[in-house]
Every structure is written in C-alpha cells, then in structure tokens.
Amino acid sequence: NFETPMPTKARFRATLTVVCVSLTLIAARASGQATADVRSQLKVADSAHLQVLTLRDGSTLIGRIVAVAQDTLTVESSVGQLSVPIASVRRVQEVASDRMKNGEYWFPNPNATRLFFAPSGRMLEKGDGYVSDYEVFFPGVAVGVTDNISIGGGMSLFPAGLDEQLFYLTPKIGGALQENVNVAVGALIIGGIADESTVGIVYGVGTFGSPDASLTAGLGYGFSGTTMSRTPVAMLGGELRVSRRIGLVTENYIIPDTDANPIFSYGVRLMGEKMTVDLALFNAGGSGSAIGLPFVDFVFRF
C-alpha cells in the first residue's frame, strides 16, 4: 500500500504542537513541584521576624504571614492585609525585623568575611562560600568547611605559561567570642607552579561591630620557606554600610619600628544580595601620589 506523505507545513504544525504540549506538561509539573516547595515555607511569623515573599512576576512583598488557607495566604504589610494566591509565590524568606530600615529591606552583607584584601574576624558558615576575582588576574574560591573552619585558594591568570603562574591557599579558623565580637587566625600561602618554595603571612584578626558597621584589627608575620619574619605587620580597617546597596571600606597597613611607609586605602563596596564589587585606591604614605593605585574585586556568594 502506498501512503501519501504528509505535506511539509502539516509536519511542521504537528511537530510544533507536540513540542508545545510537551513543554506545557513539563512546565505544569515544574510549577506543581515549585508550589509544593513554597507550601513547605509557609508559616505564621512571630513578632521578631518579617517575611520576604518573592512573587513569580519578579516583585517582592514584605510583611508577615498571618493566615494560610488552601489556595491563598494573608499577609500583613505596611499597606494593610493582603490576600495572595499561593500559586503566585516563588519563594518565602524569613528575616529579622531589624533588617527593615526606612521601609526598605536591607539584605545581609554578602561579603562580611573580608575587607578589600584582608580577612575580617567573621567566618563563613558551613556550606557557604564565594567565588572571587581580585585585580582581574587573581581568581579564587573559598568554602566554609564548618562554622569555624574555612579553606580558600586560587591561581593567577597572568598572560604567561603555566610554569610562571602562582597559586595561593587561605586556611582560616575562628568564631564569635560574643555578639559583635569575632576573632580568627589564618594564613595566606603563596607558591609558584614550578617552584617548591612558598612565601606568605600568618595572622590573627578581630572584628568588632555588626556586619553593617565594624572595625577590624589584625597582626601578621611574613614568612619565606621556614624562615619567619621577626617584625609584624599591623592592619586596621573597617566597613560602614551607608545605604541598602553601598558601603564604605578602608584597609590600612603599618610595619612598626621600621622606616617603611604605611599603606592606606579607601573605597566603596557595591552590594547585591549575592554579589559585591569593590572599587578602591591604595596609597603609600609619603609616596607623593595623591590618588593611589586602583583596586577592583568581584565576589559572588553561594
């Protein structure tokens, strides 16, 4: 028997229909799973917390869930009680009430464990981490192994061969002595890919204040191979968040009992919920340069 082949346009329509139906079924299944995940996040908030509801249209609603029904939830917000379909909610995040300032939600500082280059006394929590890139040529990554131990590292990306690249490791141990007082010890270890010798610094550091306004002081000793410097390097820095997305940062170094010029820096930190960009200038006291050397870094939190 001879079968008449389906015309090209008809085949295209049939294929398009199958694809559309398949995508619709996949989307429906994903939507159903997402709705089930959201339901597990729904609960009535206490007076010490607010809830940030991210809706599927990209908008954000901030308030407290006061009632949960089968298909809707009631949210107490700054404009009164609102009835919100559960199917329209993509995510619910519970935050402390003090994160609201002048009617805006201030997300937590995503880069509270560092100033520009120097570490603060704060630690990454277990499983948290970040990917960073300093001055374009120095990418790296750091992860919280536990709430009190983190490990980081990276490798240079100079426009040269592999044998001419540097690697670095940044182990760190620390914790909170009390609220708003955090201390840590750690090291920066630098080596060459083709060179077995290492240089670096071991340090102790303390941070005093909140993640949005803090002072950090540290002391470190440089080393080369197994030889440790007898003269420490002192660091004093701080961070002040001046708006929801902007902070001011400074990081300064001095070598006591030497003629070395102190190094000071100042700059801004641009913040998103998961990413920061630092733009700064570093200068040496007495160098005669009024502006300083530019410094830029990018940090993405995960």
Predicted regions and their residues:
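Bacterial N-terminal signal peptides that target proteins for export
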Residues: P7-T17
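Compositionally biased alpha-helical segments
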Residues: G32-D133, F137
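Feature captures outer-membrane beta-barrel proteins of Gram-negative bacteria and organelles
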Residues: F137-F158, Q165-V185, V199-A217, R230-R244, ...
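Cleavable N-terminal signal peptides
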Residues: V19-C20, A30, A34
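Gram-negative outer-membrane beta-barrel proteins
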Residues: P159-G161, L177, G191-D195, D212, ...
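Bacterial N-terminal signal peptides
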Residues: T15-I26
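Short, Lys/Arg-enriched N-terminal segments with co-localized hydrophobic residues
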Residues: N1-P5
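Short hydrophobic/aromatic-rich beta-strand segments that constitute the beta-sheet cores
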Residues: T74-V75, R91, I151-G153, L248-T250, ...
